[in-house]
Amino acid sequence: RMVLNPDVTVRSRGVVEKCSFCVQRIQEKKIKAKVEGRILGDGEIQPACVQSCPANALVFGDMNNPESKISKYMKNERNYHLLEELHTLPSVGYLTKVRNKKA
């Protein structure tokens, strides 16, 4: 038996929610850093998916900071974006599987 959550809007069939990257967590950390008079550290903000991933397969950070972990991943030659040919300019990147070139 399904139980309805009154805090969640029921969507029409075929409609999915877009990930907000836990904007509430981002804002909370930004405000805290501003109050403390400092800049955010690399990896200080973690959406729920990143925090709960047991394999550390997800990375979140500031792509405008060339020294950040995410920036380095995005420059990796294995990085690609879905539907890149349509120039959608997504902020999510994927690393291809490492393949043995000599095989």
Question: What do the predicted segments below correspond to?
Answer:
Residues 1-103:
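Non-ligating segments of multi-cofactor redox enzymes
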